[in-house]
Amino acid sequence: MKIILCSACDVPKLSEMNKYLIEDEKSHNHMHLVELEHRMSEFLDREYNAYLFIEEEKVVGYALVKYLPDGYYLRQFFIDRDFRRRHLGTAAFNELLKELNAESIIIDCLPWNEAGLSFWKSLGFKEAAITMKLKKS
């Protein structure tokens, strides 16, 4: 597994994978690809770094990470559907840890995303908070 720091030229590929991530986690985000590209560009222009995960010369996923004073915030982590169930998510995450030299990482996982919750717990993550939302009609 190789990990590559992304640049602006990677925004289309990152945004495409972000669209799949949104679908897979059944997020309430209804942004179109053009909107996701704009948002990804803003993330990279500001305080986030994105990394591509490469296995056998193929892009298999990505991560979007922000540095915090006490560690890192992993905003997005995605492994392509065609490459799942092969331990590539674990390998990619371990490469990311090495790349960042991270002691602490914070993630968010939607409560109905059972596959995501199971994956993160398998890596040793524990619940640290519960975020709640009120949406008035």
Sequence positions of predicted segments:
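A short beta-loop-alpha structural element at the N-terminal edge
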Residues: M1-E16
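Conserved GNAT-fold acetyl-CoA-binding loop/helix
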Residues: N18-M40
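A short helix-loop-beta-strand connector motif used in the catalytic cores of GNAT acetyltransferases and
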Residues: S41-L52
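Conserved beta-strand in the GNAT
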Residues: L52, K58-K66, Y73, F78
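Conserved beta-strand-loop-alpha-helix junction that forms the acyl-donor binding cleft
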Residues: I106-L117, K133-S137
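Conserved acetyl-CoA-binding loop of GNAT-fold acetyltransferases
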Residues: K121-I130
